[in-house]
Amino acid sequence: MWLYYTRLAWLSLKRHPLLSLLMSGAIALGIGAAMTTITINYLMSADPIPEKSDRLFYVQLDNWSPNEPYDEPNEPPDQLTYTDATALKAQAPAQLQTALAQSGGVIEPQGLGKEPFLARLRLTHNDFFTMFNAPFLYGQGWSDSADETGDRSIVLSKSANEEIFAGENSVGRTVRLEGKEFRVVGVLDEWVLKPRFYDVTTGAFNEMEDAYLPFKLKETMELPNSGNTNCWKMPEGEGFKSFLTSECVNFQFWVQLDSA
């Protein structure tokens, strides 16, 4: 029976080659589209950190206009203002907590033949590395005092460390970023989160950052904004400080609790 139907298929293929090709292509396209949809759905629904996902919480506050909702009624913005993020860090009683912001800056590697490059930066607090199980290849995160003072400490990704230091243990060495010298305190091992859940506002499947800096440097170095910035009213005044005290949302905040 199988040979009979195989023969019929072969005769039909010879009789209508173009139609057979189109039908095969349509079936292949359908299978490809279905597999792509299944893969995306699997990645988006998978728990990226199952060992503690029930203890990690993303904080939202409603700072939006009293006259109109941010999006849907009773739905707060998906990010925070700088004022709210820093106040939460200072006053929240969580076991671990961190504010987050995305930025960018030029790193100038030392050595012949090494060109400056624009690095993806993540401004955060040192709790970030513990909360999200960041794997370290060398060193560790910066100290609590670096969070408080805005010490120019830096944690590099594995790829950035390879670009700047050829993959060597660079802890204790210096990196020039935005014209300032930073001390390397740690280098991450290969780390890929799919989805990159700690900041889905800028893309759940965006690439991981090249370097991580103390959050306070956002203010002291006046580092540029990146990602999504939304304001319900314009900042009062001019300059960088007026943005930080404005009602514009561009920051994230996470807490880890002892139990769910």
Description of each model-found segment:
Residues 1, 8, 23, 32, ...:
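Amphipathic alpha-helical recognition patches that constitute DNA-binding helices
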Residues 2-14, 84, 88:
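A short amphipathic helical element positioned immediately N-terminal to and/or at the very start
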Residues 14-15, 256:
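Alpha-solenoid HEAT/Armadillo repeat architecture
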Residues 16-48:
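Short, strongly hydrophobic transmembrane alpha-helices
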Residues 21-22, 98-99, 196:
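Short, hydrophobic secondary-structure boundary micro-motifs
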Residues 24-28, 56, 174, 181:
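Residues at or immediately flanking beta-strands
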Residues 38-164, 168, 178:
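Structured, solvent-exposed hinge/loop segments at the ends of secondary-structure elements
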Residues 126-142, 152-260:
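Mid-to-C-terminal secondary-structure elements
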